[in-house]
């Protein structure tokens, strides 16, 4: 099944009109702490590894399953779109039916020349938060899965 794609503005509109929808920011903990869509929770789909670049988070689906039921409406986003597209696919494989990937992510998607091809959440002027505490941080999400 193809992953549904939405723009940052569409994501914001859904989150504003449907409080039961959750936004999962799949970027690293550091990226999340530097700013994220208001109301987002952080569950990284991959972690940085100095020797290998990015490595998949083996607990990604488990942490999502612990925190959110399979019938939950979920929007996933990353920095530009590719990581969240992969995360959305993993969630669909795990049985989540209502998952959308936010194209452009938080920072915007660029072509090889550096031109913005899909503006991100921040550039769209949407609400940004730096809250990284209980209930939104990866550490608080993963603690429930232990």
Where are these regions (language model features)?
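Rhodanese-like catalytic fold shared by cysteine-dependent sulfurtransferases
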Residues: 1-22, 29-73, 84-146
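Short, surface-exposed ligand- or partner-binding patches at beta-edge/loop junctions that are enriched
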Residues: 76-77
